[in-house]
């Protein structure tokens, strides 16, 4: 998967690329100096950000060593890449102004642990930009969580669950984060 991620035959990974302009637009609303990309894969978003803002520092975190190896091959001078768990960030407290997580949250078995790590590692007034698959249609979410996610796991995709607005809101509240905006765009996005 790591080698395929940024190819023209990436399949599901193509969905991630559609998020980049909106993530960039959201990041540009407030200044940041240190950014974490949680579930960074081979770091396509960090590559784009580093070109646009070379004076800032970026950290990529991914559980998969092959993804981090691909990211490191890019030799991004203002970036650090770490193999680690997005449910238990291996970083000191208050070390990031912004954390982005694009299309990896549905892989996390313990969503609350992720939000707790975000809260611990964000500086005061820092922000999380989370993009993932979801829907307001409870039947569709049930079908995906009952059928599609388990089938995807049979093929090694590591999917766990489609998060809902309720799950995100509850996790934010329990971790002490303030949910400022929750949008569902174009069907499952």
Outline where the language-model segments fall:
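Conserved class I S-adenosyl-L-methionine
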Residues: 1-30, 44-48, 67-70, 129-152
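Class I SAM-dependent methyltransferase SAM/SAH-binding core
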Residues: 36-38, 42-88
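A conserved beta-strand element that flanks and buttresses the S-adenosyl-L-methionine
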Residues: 100
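Short catalytic micro-motifs in class I SAM-dependent methyltransferases
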Residues: 103-104
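A short glycine-rich, Lys/Arg-flanked "PGG" loop and its adjoining helix->strand segment in the class I
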Residues: 112-124
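Short alpha-helix
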Residues: 160-175
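Conserved catalytic loop of SAM-dependent methyltransferase domains
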Residues: 180-189
